[in-house]
Every structure is written in C-alpha cells, then in structure tokens.
Swiss-Prot record:
Its EC number is 6.1.1.14. This is Glycine--tRNA ligase beta subunit. Tetramer of two alpha and two beta subunits. One of its GO terms (cellular component) is cytosol.
Amino acid sequence: MHSDELLVEVLVEELPAQALLNEYKEMPKKLHALFQKRALEVGNIEVFYTPRRLCLFVKDFPLLTQETKEEFFGPPVKIACNNQDKTQGLNALGLGFYQKLGLKDHQHFQTAFKSNKEVLYHAKIHAKQPTKDLIMPIVLEFLEGLNFGKSMRWGNVEKSFIRPIHNICVLFNGENFNDIEIKEYGFKTKQATKAHRQEGFDFIEVDSPKAYFEVLEKNHVILDPKKREAKILQEIKGLEKKHDIIVEVDRDLLDEVVAITEYPTALLGEFDKAFLKLPSEIITTSMKENQRYFAIFNQKSQEESPTLHNGFIVVSNAISKDKQKIILGNQKVLKARLSDAVFFYENDLKKPLDNAPLESVVFVQGLGTLKDKMERESIIAQYLTQKYISSLSMPLEKALELISRAIQIAKADLLSEVVYEFSELQGIMGYYYALKQNENELVALSVKEQYLPASENAPLPSSVFSSIVALSLKIDSLFSLFSVGKIPSGSKDPFALRRLSFGLLKIIAHYGLEFDLKADLKNLFEKVGVYQSFDLEVLEKFLLERFHNLIDCNLSIIRSVLNTNERDIVKIIQKVKALKRFLDNPKNAQKKELLFSAFKRLANINKDRNPNESSGFSTSLFKELQEHALFEAFNAIKTSTFESLDSKIEAYFGLHAPLEEYFKSVLVMDKDIEIQKNRKNFLWGVYQSFLEIGDIKEIAI
C-alpha cells in the first residue's frame, strides 16, 4: 500500500460566516501549494467546514514523499578556478560556493552549463521520507497562512487565529497523533471530535476517517456545506409547495446560513399583516440583514408581479422536536424589528425632503458637504440635459425643471432614520418619500435609480431621465475624488470608483448617448469650475481601462481602437465590435494576415513621426506605378461615403494588395530628399486614415 486516507479536523469556536466564506475558496489552493513544497503528489483535496470546524480530507495521501533533486549553480569556472583552469582546483570564490552548501569535499567538484557558461554545480538528492512526520507542520503552516482579515489571541498562546482553536485531530494510516503539544495555540492534540452542541460537549474518540464521518452523521453534524445547502433548498421547496408561496432565495444569504449551521432546518414563520404597509424593501432588508430570514412572496399569475407575503423562512441550527417554539421566538424578534422600522418610517414621512440639512453632512473630507455635492451635480445635470434633450421626449424647459428638482432632493434620504438603519436602502427610500410628498413620478424614480448599476451585471436606470441623474452623481464623484488624489491603486478602491466608472460607461453605451471622454470631461470640469486642478488625462485613462470589462472581445482589438484619437464611448464600442465581426469572419483570414504585415511596415515607417509636422504630398512626385495605384485605391476610400462601419473596414482592409505591391516596388528612403519626404508624407496620410478605425498594429489574433 502506497497511500491511505488522510483526515484533519481543526476544532474551533464559532467562525464568523463572512470571513470564513471569503477565505474558504482559497483553502484547497493553499493546501496544494504546501504539499508541493514538500514533494507530495496529492490529487483531489476536499475541504469541508461548519461554524465549529475546518476539515480537510484526501482520499489517497502518500505514505512517503517523492525522491527529489535540488540543484545549485555557482560562479563561472573562469573566475572560480585557479588560473581560470578547472584542472588546477578551486580558488577562494569557488571554495566559498561549496562551503555555503556545507560540503567538505572540494576535490571532485562538478560543473554544468547555464546560459552558455560553464559554472560550478552541485546536486543534492533528497531521499523519500515518511509523510506522517510532515502532516502536523503542514497543518500549522496552513492555519498560519489563512487570511480572515482579523485575528485574535487567547490565553498565553503565541499565535493568533480568527477564533480560539481547541483541537487538531489527525487520522492517517493508523498512526498515533494523540498528545502532540501545540504550543502555538495552547493545547495537546486528541484523535477525537465533538458532536453538535445540543448532542453534548465531550470529546468523542475516533480512529479513522470512516469512524469520524459516522460519528458526525449520528450526532447531527452535516460536514459538507453542499449537503447542508441541498437540505435547506429541499425543505424550502417543500414549504413553497405546501403553502403555495414563492421564497426569494438570496444567494449571499443562503451561503451565510449554510456557514452558521451544522444541522439546518428550514421553518416557516409569519408576521402581522399590518406591517405590509411598510415599503417591501424595508421588510426584506430587515429580515435579511438583522435576522437572516428569507423573504416570501405570494404566488401570482404569470401576468402579475409577486407581492410580499407576511411570512418568512428561518433556518434553525437547533435540534428540537418543538419547532413551534423556535418559530414563535423568531416571530417575536421580527415583530420588535419591524415595529422599530414603522417608527423610523413614519418619523421620516413627517419631514419634507426640502428640509433635509444637507449642509450638515460632509461628503468626503476636503470635498465639502452633501449640499456642495448636490450643487455640483446640478450643473453637470443641466449640461447633460441640454446634450440629451432629443432623448427625453419633453421640452427643454420642462426637462431642466424636473432634472433640477430630482438633483435637489436626491440626497435627502441619506439623513432619514430608515437609511441610517439600513444604508443599502439609500435612493430606494428617497423614491418612496418623494411619491408620498407628491413629487413627479419621473423625479421620484430617478432618485431611486441614481446609484445604479450596483454591480457589473445589475440593472441600469430605466430611462434617459434617470440616467442623467445617475451620470451626474458618478461624474461629480470622479472629478471630486480624483482632484484630491483619492485614485484607486492596486486592489484598493475604498470609494468603489472602478465600479462607478464601469456603471457610467455601461449607462452611456446602453442608451447610445454621445459622450466624448476628452471633450465632454473637459467641458464639464470647466463648467462646474470648483474642483481642484488635476490632469484630466489620468481620469480619461482610468475610464478607458474599464472598456476591457465592458466589451466581450479580444483585448488587442479593444487596445487597437483605444490607441486612436477616438474618445466617444459609443463610437469606441461600435468600432471594436465592427473590427471583431470582420476579423472573426473566416472569409477574411488571408486578407487580415496580409494587411497586418503591410500595416506593421506602415507603422514602423511612421513610428518616429512628429504628428505636428507638415504632411502635404504631391502626386506629381510619384515615380512608380505602384505609388499611383496605392494613391488611387486610398483616394477612392477617402472620397467615399459608407453605409456602415463594416463596409468602411472592409474597404480599408482591401488596401492590403496595393500596400504589398507598394512595399515590394517602392523605395521609401529615396536618395532624392524631396521624393523621400513626399513618400513619407503620403504614407503618413494613409496611416492616419487607418486610425479612423483602429491602430491595426496592436491587433494580435
């Protein structure tokens, strides 16, 4: 037998769900790295968790490590040997190399070739060794390498961990792993585990992985999170069918309840229907954030949208036959929460949105108050309203009035009691308060949708009107934060500016709005006129980098368009997609290869060209037929009107033949300086025209 089952359980106090979930997906990768480091060939590693334990299981764990060879390369023979001759022995430098390796025999040294040089060489062979001696060091290094964000110390232990560790149980090949002192965490190991808390607190001895799994199963611990999830979903499905309801299974919430339970049971509770007078988002948010309950909706016909039901699903970790007692306890807690919500909501309704003291709340240190932000957004919104009036289906005067009103009240709900309690309801509560105070419905909806999209694949504002409000917020935030140097770097993005920028691009692309990242940003920056000065090209570049997430396309095609002077967002996307269509067409395979080759030569000729240099040329100085042929083909394109971008790209790629012939027959660097300059200027014009569709030399397919 060359392998056996390995099981390691780390018994801990209750792990915080979110920290555990964030790190869980990295655990197999980290274990693989530790095994490889010690020459262990390990196949599939299964990692399980409950709130009280981390468990790793390997079906075929080797009994011995592999034999490995460790190579050491020293200085070149020429400088490591006496008189640069290896037959005359080592000098001080050569001896030093072997002494560092702890070797005493220097007489029979070896050499090898590295980077075409003969160098001193030594190989150490590491023999196979029993893996049982490596398991505990690997486990301890694994625990130390886990990153949960925060950690704690307890007692007099040397190391910290997210929660106190009570035991490490190792089961492998019948070996004894009892009473190993783990000084780092202050305990001695036991080959034992613990049951569900309600089954008892004592250790239960186990002598094999099989026995371990059986003990947990008998004692109400479902070790595999996938099985706990399946149990929850199956029970929810049963409740849906029995009570003719729809349960909203929120993915994040499901992951969380799986992480906080060892033996989950889904139960149906209810609350007083009187609470349904609250906006549904208050109820569902309170249930999810405070109590980890799943919301329930009434079953409706396909034509009707489901409405919130006065029920909820609680996932209990308790082992009890008296389910009603658990349900009643949760109903009592929820009633108190919703009573508070009613109090907050009714208090908010008494306060006119106009009276919100925005001047009392700082937006960001150094960037004024919410009132200052509102005033900046108002100027941006006026500019965008005038720019997009043809998409608003109303007179300009009316549009400006409504947009101005929307901006004026957009931030008022940030000072409400409900949003103070549930910050994720910002905008949503503003919508409800606006409707209650008889604001125009477009205005109210734009307040709700100003923060959209909330994530990469989330819904966008539902109209151009709402989009103007959302864009104004985003543009001001970018200008403001960039102006005080709060620019994302590395993985740090505390103000979520990457997401905000992506949302800006996505809105503009979705509605086909004209927006030039150079001209419009400059105009808006100057129009608002209160931002601290900074290089707008930094912001422009930051926004251009987001296109790689916006368009599903070969990155080199995106780069080819971004390398041109095109800065209109919609036109950039159109050009990228048109180039992709052309290049993906099998009929164009040969044509594109020929053009890539010719265009790279064209680009090389012009790489050091000063864009401001005079570029005039005269056909009277053309001497070769191929010059005239290329000019005629090029001029035909320049003077044509194309029905579509696709046909324009087709025409430009058709220049591959005359370009090839030109480069075969025409010497650009003619001895006659006037002819040479004329040819360079002509090719510069051809090159610049190509940039109307993309910088072809960037494309790598």
